[in-house]
UniProtKB/Swiss-Prot annotation:
Coiled coil: none annotated. This is Mediator of RNA polymerase II transcription subunit 24. A motif (LXXLL motif 2) lies at residues 341-345. One of its GO terms (biological process) is positive regulation of transcription initiation by RNA polymerase II. It comes from the Eukaryota. InterPro entries: Mediator_Med24.
Length: 988
C-alpha cells in the first residue's frame, strides 16, 4: 500500500501546485522516519507520474530534481528508473530524461554500504544500455524522418550523453565492475552496441558517425581496462636482461631451459621491454660472455650455452608469445641491430676464430625463429662487414678448429654415445674402451660434456657412466687383457664422473633415489669422501675407515713391497675404500721414521701408476687430513699430495695413461684448491693440459667481506653491467656472509644512491644479483629488511626519493618473481647447495594457524571493530586483515605467502597511521609499482594478500586515487572484491 500512498501524495502535490521544497517538507511528514525513499521507489514513482503524457510534467520533474539535489533519492534508483522508460518516440520525454542524467552522471558518488555501491554500478550499466538503445532508435529513425535536422539533433543529444558517461574513467571502471557482477546484462550491452555499430554505418553525417564510433570504441575498451599500462621510458640498455643471461650461462648451464624462459618472460613483462630490444640484449649478453670467458672449460660451457641452449630457450619463448609470426620479425630486427655492433662482433669472431653470427643465424633458422630469406640476407650483410674485420695474424689460426663448430658437431655425438652406452658392456668391452679413449683425447670430453649440459642430457650421460662403473664390479674368470680393460673402464668412468661433479655439480651424479636397492659405489663415495662444494670432511670419519682391517693391511703390504699394482681379480671399489686407511698407516710410518722418502715415492708411484682413481681417493683423504693439522705439521702430507699428482714417465703404464693423468690432475687441482683456499696453501699440478680453476681465490685476501661486497657493487654500478667474474664474487659473498647479511648490505648500498639514473640502474642490477637465490633473498627482503625500515622512525629518512622509490621497485619485482615461481620446479643447483642456517624459521615467525596470530598481526588487528568470521567467506565482514588470499584458500604453509600477508598488514598500518612521511611515500611507490607490474587479469598476483580494508586507505593518497589503480589492486573475481572496489570508486 505504500506505493499507492506515494502516488497519492505526488498527485496531491501536483493538484495543489506545491513548490519543490514544500513538497519535500510534506513528504517527510506523510512518511515515517527510518523508511528510505529508495525502498519506496520514490524516483520511479515520480518518473512514472511525470511521463504520463506526450510531454513531461514540469512540476513533478522539479520534485525529482529537488530529490536528486537534496539526496533524497540515490543516483542508482534514478538511473534504474530512467532505464525502464522505453517509449523513445516521445522526444520531449527523452530530452528531459537526458537532462536529468546531466545533473549527476559526470560525478557519480555513493557513500552508503558496499551493496549500494554495487547497485550504482548495475544501474549505470543499465543506463548505458538504455542510451545505446535510444541512439540506435534515433539512428534508424533518420532513414524515414521528414525533418533530418531534428532527427540529427535528437541523435546528437544521445551521443553527447554517451560520450559524457563513457569519457569518465571512473564511470567506465564502475561499468567494468558491473560487467563482472552481471555478465548477462553486459551481454545485452554488447548486443545493443553491435546494433548501433551496424546502424551508424549508414549515417550521412560524418560528424555524428565519428561521434558514435568514438562511443563504441570506449565501450569496447571497458573489458580490457586493466591491460593498459603506462609506456616504459626507453633506455639505451637493459642490465637486468644482460645479468640474467650472464648468470644462467656462468652458473646454471645444466639447468632446465623452461625456468630460464619464464624468468626472461617475467623480466620482459615487468620492465615493458619491446621484444626486439629484449632479444638484442640476450644476444649481446651471450657474445660478451663468449669474449670474456676464461680459456678452457668455461669457454666451452659459454659456447654451448650461446649456440645450443639460448636458441632452444628462445624457441620456447616464442611459444609463449601471443603472435608467433611477429616473433620472427622481432628476431630479424634484433639481428639487424646486432649487426650494427661491428666492433663487438669482430672481437667475438676473433676470439672464436669463426663467424659467430652466421652460426647463430643458422641455429635460429633450424628452430623456426628466422625464415630462410631473412637468414640469407643477414648472413650476407655480416659477410660483407667481415671483409673489413681484423684478422688474426698467427699462422696457427688456420689449423685451429673453432669451438662453436665443434660444440654444434658434439651435440649429435652425445646422442650417439648415449646409444652406444646402452649396449651390453659384457659383449664388447674393448670396443667400448675405444669409444671412451676417443672421448678422452684432446678437449673432446669437455666438448661433449658442455654439449650434453646445454641440451639437458648431462644427467643421462652421467647415469650411463655410473652404470659402467658398476659393471666393472662384477668379476668372472678373466685374462690379463680382460683385467686391463676392466681396470681401464673403472678408472675412466670414475675420473669422468669426478670431472662432471666438479665442473657441473654433484646433482648431475645423484640419482632421484634408490628405493629397495643399493646406492651405486660412486654416488656413495662422492657424497661421503669427495671434497668440494663447501663440504668440510673429517679425516677420522668412518667413511674413511675400511671395516676389513686385513684388507687394509694387505693393501699396505702390496703398495710397500710390490713394484706395481696387480690388476687381475682386483675389486677396484674395495681398493678405493681401503686407500684412505692405507694412506693413514703409510703416513704415520713416514712420520715416525719407519719409511723413508724413497719408499714413499715408490708407494705413490704404485698408487698412481696404473689406475689414477686410486690417487684421487688418496688425495681426497689427505686434503681432509691437512685441514686438521697445524701449519708446521703439513709438510709430509702436502708432499704426498704433490707426489700423487705428478705424472709418471715410462712404458709400464696402461692404455690412455697421459689422457687419464690430465683429467686426474684437473680433479686434484680442483679438490685441493677448494679445500685449501682458507689455509693460504696452494698446490700446483704440472700435468700437461691441466688448467687452473678460473674462479678460485678471487676474493681479495685480508679484506673484510663487507668492503669486498661494497666495492664489487660500486664497480658494477659504475660500469652498468655485471660480468661473470663479478657474479662468482657475489655468489661467494652470499655463501660466506649468509642471506640476511648479503641482502641487508646490498639494500644499504642501494639506499645510499641519490642519483636517479644510478638508483634505477642499481635496481636492475640488484634484481639480477638476487637471482643467485631469489626465493631466500626475497623472503629476507620482505620479511626482515623492509619491516625494519618501515617500523623504525630513525630509518625513515633513508626511504626518500630516489633510493626509496628504487627499493620499492626492487621489492615488487622480487616479490612477483618469487611468487610466480615458488611452486614451479626445483631450485637451481647453486640454491640447493646454499646453507640455510641464517634464515629465521618462518613457521614460528608467521604461524600457520590463522587463529594463532603473530605478534605483528595481533598489533595491527587490535583496532578491529568486527571480530566474527562467518562460515561463508563471501559474507565475511571486512575486518582489517581479511584478504583475497584467505578467500581463495591460498596455502599459508608457504613462507612467502606468510611474509607477503604480514608485509601488507604492515603497509596497511603505515597508511592508517596519523604520521605521514617518507614511509607513507614508500608505500605509495610500492603500490604504484605493483599496479605497473601487474599481469593482464591480475589473478594470482601478490596483491591478493592485501587486506580489503586497505583499499579505502589507499584512495586517500592523491596519486593512488585513480579508478584504474582501484580496479588493479582489488581481486575482481571475488564478489567481496567487487564490492570493495565499487565502494572505493564511488567515494572518489
Amino acid at each position: 500500500m505504500k506505493l499507492v500512498n506515494l502516488k497519492q501524495a505526488i498527485l496531491q502535490a501536483w493538484k495543489e501546485r506545491w513548490s519543490d521544497y514544500q513538497w519535500a517538507i510534506n513528504m517527510k511528514k506523510f512518511f515515517p522516519k527510518g523508511v528510505t525513499w529508495d525502498i519506496l521507489n520514490l524516483a520511479e514513482a515520480l518518473l512514472d507520474q511525470a511521463m504520463i503524457g506526450p510531454a513531461p510534467n514540469p512540476l513533478i520533474l522539479s520534485y525529482l530534481k529537488y530529490a536528486i539535489n537534496s539526496q533524497m533519492v540515490s543516483y542508482s534508483t534514478v538511473l534504474t528508473a530512467i532505464s525502464k522508460f522505453d517509449d523513445f518516440s516521445r522526444d520531449l520525454c527523452i530530452q528531459s530524461l537526458l537532462e536529468i542524467m546531466d545533473m549527476f552522471c559526470d560525478n557519480l558518488s555513493c557513500h552508503g554500504k558496499a551493496e549500494e555501491c554495487i547497485g550504482l554500478c548495475r544501474a549505470l550499466m543499465s543506463a548505458l544500455n538504455w542510451l545505446l538503445r535510444c541512439a540506435t532508435f534515433y539512428t534508424d529513425k533518420l532513414k524515414d524522418v521528414l525533418d533530418p535536422v531534428a532527427g540529427e539533433n535528437h541523435l546528437s543529444m544521445c551521443l553527447q550523453r554517451l560520450k559524457s558517461i563513457l569519457g569518465s574513467t571512473k564511470n567506465r571502471a564502475l561499468i567494468h565492475i558491473a560487467k563482472l557482477e552481471e555478465p548477462t546484462s553486459w551481454t545485452s550491452v554488447e548486443q545493443s552496441q553491435l546494433r548501433l555499430s551496424e546502424s551508424i554505418s549508414l549515417l550521412p553525417s560524418v560528424q555524428l558517425r565519428n561521434q558514435a564510433e568514438e562511443c563504441v570504441s570506449l565501450i569496447r575498451s571497458i573489458p580490457s581496462m586493466l591491460s593498459v599500462h603506462s609506456d616504459q621510458l626507453q633506455t639505451n640498455g637493459f642490465p637486468t636482461v644482460h645479468a640474467v643471461v650472464m648468470l644462467e650461462g656462468t652458473m646454471n648451464l645444466t639447468g632446465d631451459a623452461q625456468p630460464l624462459v619464464e624468468q626472461m618472460n617475467t623480466v620482459k613483462r615487468m620492465q615493458r621491454i619491446p621484444l626486439h630490444l629484449f632479444l638484442l640484449e640476450v644476444w649481446k649478453a651471450c657474445i660478451v660472455g663468449l669474449i670474456e670467458s676464461p680459456e678452457g672449460t668455461e669457454e666451452l660451457k659459454w659456447t654451448a650455452f650461446t649456440f645450443l641452449k639460448i636458441p632452444q630457450a628462445l624457441a620456447k619463448l616464442k611459444k609463449l608469445s601471443s603472435m608467433e609470426q611477429d616473433f620472427n620479425e622481432d628476431m630479424k630486427c634484433a639481428f639487424e641491430y646486432l649487426l650494427k655492433l661491428t666492433p663487438l662482433l669482430d672481437k667475438a669472431d676473433q676470439r672464436c676464430n669463426c663467424d659467430c653470427v652466421s652460426l647463430l643465424l643458422q641455429e635460429c633458422n633450424k628452430l623456426g625463429l628466422l625464415s630462410e630469406q631473412n637468414m640469407e640476407n643477414l648472413m650476407a650483410k655480416r659477410t660483407a662487414d667481415r671483409e673489413q674485420a681484423p684478422r688474426l695474424k698467427s699462422s696457427e689460426n688456420s689449423t685451429i678448429q673453432p669451438n662453436p663448430g665443434l660444440i654444434l658437431r658434439a651435440e649429435p655425438t652425445v646422442t650417439n654415445i648415449l646409444k652406444t652406452m646402452d649396449a651390453d658392456h659384457s659383449k664388447s668391452p674393448e670396443g667400448l674402451l675405444g669409444v671412451l679413449g676417443h672421448m678422452l683425447s684432446g678437449k673432446s670430453l669437455d666438448l661433449l660434456l658442455a654439449a650434453a649440459a646445454a641440451t639437458g642430457k648431462l644427467k643421462s650421460f652421467a647415469r650411463k657412466f655410473i652404470q659402467l662403473n658398476e659393471f666393472t664390479r662384477h668379476i668372472g674368470v678373466e685374462s690379463s687383457k680382460a683385467a686391463n680393460v676392466r681396470a681401464l673402464l673403472f678408472d675412466i668412468s670414475f675420473l669422468m664422473l669426478c670431472h662432471v661433479a666438479q665442473t657441473y655439480g654433484s646433482e648431475m651424479i645423484l640419482s632421484e633415489g634408490c628405493p629397495g636397492g643399493e646406492m651405486p659405489f660412486f654416488e656413495s663415495w662422492m657424497q661421503t669422501c669427495m671434497p668440494g662444494e663447501g663440504r668440510v670432511l673429517n679425516p677420522d670419519h668412518p667413511c674413511f675407515r675400511h671395516p676389513d682391517i686385513a684388507k687394509v693391511e694387505a693393501l699396505v703390504a702390496l703398495l710397500n713391497t710390490s713394484t706395481e699394482m696387480k690388476l687381475a681379480q682386483t675389486k677396484w671399489h674395495e681398493v678405493c675404500l681401503s686407500i684412505p686407511a692405507a694412506i693413514l698407516e703409510i703416513h704415520n710410518a713416514w712420520e715416525n721414521g719407519v719409511l723413508s722418502s724413497e719408499a714413499i715415492q715408490k708407494i705413490t708411484d704404485n698408487i698412481k701408476g696404473k689406475v689414477c682413481s686410486l690417487a684421487v681417493c688418496a688425495v681426497a683423504w689427505l686434503v681432509a687430513h691437512v685441514r686438521m693439522l697445524g701449519l708446521d705439521e703439513r709438510d709430509k702430507s702436502l708432499q704426498m699430495i704433490r707426489q700423487l699428482g705428478s705424472p709418471m714417465f715410462g712404458d709400464n703404464t696402461l692404455q690412455f695413461y697421459s689422457e687419464r693423468v690430465i683429467i686426474m690432475s684437473s680433479i686434484l687441482d680442483n679438490m685441493c684448491s677448494e679445500v685449501l683456499q682458507q689455509t693460504t696453501t696452494q698446490i700446483k699440478f704440472s700435468a700437461a693440459g691441466s688448467e687452473p680453476m678460473p674462479y678460485i681465490h678471487r676474493l681479495p685476501p685480508k679484506t673484510p667481506i663487507k668492503e669486498v661486497l661494497r666495492g664489487a657493487f660500486s664497480s658494477t654500478l659504475e660500469k652498468g653491467w655485471v660480468d661473470s667474474r663479478t657474479l662468482h664474487n657475489f655468489d661467494t659473498l652470499l655463501h660466506m656472509g649468509g642471506v640476511y647479511w648479503f641482502c641487508n648490505n646490498l639494500v644499504k648500498e642501494l639506499l645510499r644512491e641519490t642519483r636517479l639514473e644510478f638508483a634505477l640502474r642499481a635496481v636492475e642490477l640488484l634484481y639480477a644479483i638476487f637471482c643467485l637465490d631469489m626465493q631466500q633473498l626475497t623472503l629476507t627482503l620482505l620479511g626482515h629488511v623492509l619491516p625494519s625500515l618501515l617500523t623504525d622512525s630513525a630509518k625513515w629518512h633513508m626511504l626518500m626519493d630516489p633510493p626509496g622509490r628504487a627499493l620499492a621497485k626492487l621489492s615488487v619485482w622480487c616479490a612477483m618473481t618469487s611468487y610466480s615461481t615458488q611452486n614451479k620446479g626445483q631450485p637451481s643447483p647453486r640454491q640447493r647447495k646454499r646453507h640455510r642456517e641464517d634464515i629465521e624459521d618462518y613457521s614460528s615467525l608467521f604461524p600457520l594457524d590463522d587463529t594463532q596470530q603473530s605478534k605483528l598481526m595481533r598489533l595491527l588487528s587490535s583496532n578491529e571493530e568486527e571480530h566474527n568470521v562467518q562460515a561463508n567467506p563471501v559474507d565475511r565482514p571486512m575486518n582489517s586483515s581479511l584478504s583475497a588470499s584467505q578467500i581463495h584458500n591460498i596455502s599459508s604453509k608457504e613462507p612467502l605467502n606468510r611474509v607477503l600477508a604480514n608485509l601488507f598488514l604492515l603497509i596497511s598500518s603505515v597508511l592508517g597511521a596519523k604520521t605521514a612521511g617518507a614511509q607513507t611515500q614508500f608505500v605509495q611507490w610500492f603500490m604504484e609499482e605493483c599496479v605497473e607490474s601487474l599481469e593482464l587479469g591480475g589473478k594470482g598476483c601478490i596483491l591478493q594478500f592485501m587486506p580489503f580494508s586497505m583499499v579505502s586507505e589507499l584512495v586517500k593518497v592523491s596519486t593512488l586515487s585513480s579508478p584504474k589503480i582501484v580496479l588493479a589492486i582489488t581481486d575482481l573475481t571475488l564478489p567481496l572484491g567487487r564490492r570493495v572496489a565499487a565502494k572505493a570508486l564511488t567515494a572518489l
